[in-house]
Structures are given as structure tokens and as C-alpha cells.
């Protein structure tokens, strides 16, 4: 979904500071290239990062938003940010195609003896041409695999990545079972009509040749795949996990590999035990967390993260926040109040009453809430006084207020 900058004459010049953690694609930094943006580590308005483990010390009193160039936000102290009225963004979908393509690659690696075949071919480096031909023809039977066409893939999580994967595997002639109890209407529209939506996780697990996970890491999804549901897998199923390592219980997976319940485990999250198993060439294929590591994905994530931070700082717009609701209001004046507060009855009346007491006219306003948190955008016909801003700021349940 494209994001738009407000370039109308209502915008007045204000300088914002931002701090970047990790390396960020230049295309993203260019979004903040105007004179009103300064890269400054002292009291930045916006923190922009990829996988950097953000701590409480990185958050200052001036921090207004944190923008993650990527989907996962388990490296950000979200609860603390929310209490302080700091909006946390991520970039769902920006790296979806990159992950989708690597899942397809993982499925092929798990099916065709590609890695083993390559290792064998390299072991023949000192053989003559005649010897090579004989050896290859004699040994290739050991690398015989299976095709994807006609097999069943179970996709757990039908968001941006899951829906793209469903489209791709449908073209490959696979049967598709999807499971996502939180599937949105928008997500449903992206799915091919051939996708069979499972009523239960057990149904998907027991009917899928390939199972691929596309879930965020939360308290509810940690050890999502473990002994208790591995029992439901088809014998010899292949599991692909490019989401988060802790979604899968590795100890239980190794046991399932030993007893043949699972034939192959492909994951982007190596551990010492998994590496040991992979070196032994016993059903584990490891990748060094490269699911989103493409030039295109890094650019998409960086641009999206910086655009979201910019739109929030300049206009109070929120898109793809993990802790506050989406909100957008077209500008009707150059004086906009952005108020973060708890979602309680009477808050709007209290705020607007104070504005009325100052004889200020409200041009337009909007209020949105998510769980116990809310944000209100108010456009004023004339500039509010610092006295009014301080008065609203001191209200019970108001977390922060700013003029943008």
C-alpha cells in the first residue's frame, strides 16, 4: 500500500531528528533527505532499525516513533514504548516476495537431493572424464527425489508471505491447505480459489506433504510446533520454518527426524544441535537467516520504514503499527494536534472543552483506539497556545501531545 507525503501549503517547517541502527538501504535514507530531517543520535524523534536489539536506554524522552525495517518486532520493547506513547511500526509485506522465493527454494532442496548431489559432484574433482561419466551414471540413483506437482502444501499463516506462497504453489500444480484463524478480509481476497481453508491445525498437519510456517513470535506461538502436534504429521512430511526459530521446538523435531515422522527440516535459524545434524546429512537443511536478504527486500523495507516514520512525524498518520491503530486525516489547517491517550469515556469531551475554552475552532478531527490505547488528531483554525498544550498534557490519561 503506497504511502503519501503531505506536500500542501499547510505544512510548516519543523526540524526532526532521527537515529538509524544497523545498515539501512540508501533509498530509505533518501526519504528523509530534506533539510527538515537531521540524522542525530541525541534525542531523536524517530528510531529506525532492522534487527538491532533495542533497549530501554535507546529510547529517550523525545522519541515519538520506532520504525522496524522488517516484519518481526521481538527486538523492540513494545510494552515500554506503548506506555510512553511511542508508536512502533513494522513493514509487513515489504520482504514477502523474498521469503516466498526462499520457501520455494527450501522445498526443492528438501525434495531433489540437490545439496547432497552437489557435494558428491564436488568430491569427483580428481576424476577423469571417462571416470566421471561412469560414476555419475552409477550414483545418480541415490539422489532421486520427488516433484512438487501434485503434492499438498500446508501453509500456516496466510498473511503477505503465505498468500504469495499460495499463489506460487498453485501455479506449480500443488494442492494447498491454509490455516489462519486471524485471516483478514484483505488477506482472503489475495488467496487463489483453490486454497482449502482448514478448520483445524490438526487437519492441515495430517494432510500435508510440506508444511511451512509464517507466524510472528509471540507467547502464543513459541513452540507452536512441538511433540504434541508433530504426532499429527503425515509420515515423512517436510517442514520449512523461515519465520522465527523458537516457533519450533528443535528437540522434538530431532526426535521426529529420528523416528521418520519428519523426513526433512529446513530452517533459517541454525542452532548447535541442528548444525551437528546438518553436517551429518541427516534431514536438516540450514540457512543463515537469509529469508529477507535480497537487495530488493532491503530497499522495500527501508523505504517503507522511513515513509511511515515521516508520515507520522509530519501528520500523525499511522500505518502498520503493532501497538496503535491505523489513522489518517487529510489536512485542513497547518496546526494539528497529535494526542496519545488512554481509551476511556469522556476523554474527547475533556480535550475539546479545553480547546473551546481558548476560543479555538476545530477544523476537523478523528479519534481511533486499539485495546486501551487511543490517538486523536485535531486540526485547529488558529495556532494553539503553549498554555493549552500544557493543560491537555497534564490531563489524567493523556500520555503525550505535540503540534505538527
Model-identified regions with their sequence ranges:
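Rossmann-like dinucleotide-binding domain for NAD(H)/NADP(H)
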Residues: 236-331, 375, 404
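An N-terminal-biased, well-structured beta-alpha scaffold segment characteristic
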Residues: 5-91, 206, 226-232, 249, ...
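N-terminal Rossmann-fold NAD(P) dinucleotide-binding loop
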Residues: 162-163
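Oxidoreductase and adenylate-handling cofactor-binding alpha/beta cores
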Residues: 100-119, 167-174, 303-317, 352-356
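Rossmann-like adenosine-cofactor binding region
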Residues: 55-57, 181-277, 293
Amino acid at each position: 500500500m503506497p504511502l503519501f507525503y503531505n506536500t500542501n501549503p499547510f505544512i510548516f517547517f519543523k526540524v526532526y531528528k532521527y537515529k538509524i541502527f544497523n545498515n539501512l538501504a540508501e533509498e530509505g535514507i533518501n526519504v528523509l533527505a530534506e533539510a527538515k530531517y537531521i540524522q542525530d543520535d541525541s534525542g531523536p524523534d524517530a528510531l529506525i532499525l532492522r534487527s538491532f536489539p533495542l533497549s530501554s536506554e535507546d529510547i529517550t524522552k523525545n522519541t515519538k516513533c520506532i520504525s522496524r525495517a522488517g516484519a518481526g518486532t521481538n527486538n523492540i520493547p513494545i510494552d515500554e514504548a506503548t506506555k510512553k506513547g511511542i508508536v512502533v511500526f513494522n513493514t509487513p509485506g515489504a520482504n514477502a516476495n523474498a521469503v516466498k522465493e526462499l520457501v520455494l527454494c527450501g522445498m526443492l532442496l528438501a525434495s531433489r537431493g540437490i545439496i547432497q548431489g552437489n557435494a558428491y559432484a564436488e568430491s569427483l574433482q580428481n576424476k577423469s572424464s571417462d571416470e566421471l561419466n561412469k560414476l555419475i551414471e552409477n550414483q545418480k540413483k541415490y539422489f532421486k527425489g520427488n516433484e512438487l506437482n501434485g503434492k499438498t502444501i500446508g501453509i500456516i499463516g496466510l498473511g503477505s508471505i503465505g498468500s504469495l506462497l499460495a499463489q506460487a504453489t498453485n501455479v506449480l500444480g500443488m494442492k494447498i491447505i491454509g490455516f489462519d484463524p486471524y485471516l483478514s478480509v484483505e488477506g482472503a481476497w489475495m488467496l487463489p480459489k483453490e486454497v482449502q481453508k482448514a478448520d483445524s491445525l490438526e487437519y492441515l498437519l495430517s494432510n500435508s506433504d510440506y508444511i511451512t510456517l509464517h507466524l510472528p513470535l509471540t507467547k502464543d506461538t513459541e513452540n507452536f510446533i512441538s511433540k504434541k502436534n508433530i504426532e499429527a504429521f503425515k509420515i515423512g512430511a517436510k517442514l520449512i520454518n523461515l519465520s522465527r526459530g523458537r516457533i519450533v521446538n528443535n528437540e522434538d523435531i530431532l526426535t521426529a527426524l529420528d523416528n521418520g515422522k519428519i523426513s526433512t527440516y529446513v530452517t533459517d535459524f541454525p542452532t548447535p544441535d541442528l548444525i551437528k545434524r546438518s553436517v551429518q546429512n541427516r534431514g536438516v537443511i540450514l540457512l543463515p537467516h537469509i529469508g529477507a536478504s535480497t537487495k530488493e527486500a532491503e530497499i522495500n523495507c527501508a523505504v517503507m520504514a522511513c515513509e511511515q516514520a515521516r508520515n507520522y512525524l509530519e501528520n500523525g498518520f499511522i500505518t502498520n503499527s503493532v501497538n496503535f491503530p491505523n489513522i489518517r486525516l487529510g489536512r485542513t489547517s497547518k496546526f494539528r494536534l497529535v494526542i496519545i491517550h488512554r481509551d476511556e469515556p469522556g476523554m474527547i469531551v475533556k480535550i475539546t472543552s479545553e480547546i473551546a475554552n481558548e476560543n479555538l475552532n476545530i477544523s476537523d478531527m478523528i479519534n481511533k483506539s486499539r485495546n486501551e490505547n487511543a490517538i486523536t488528531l485535531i486540526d485547529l483554525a488558529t495556532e494553539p497556545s503553549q498554555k493549552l498544550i500544557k493543560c491537555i498534557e497534564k490531563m489524567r490519561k493523556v500520555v503525550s501531545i505535540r503540534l505538527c
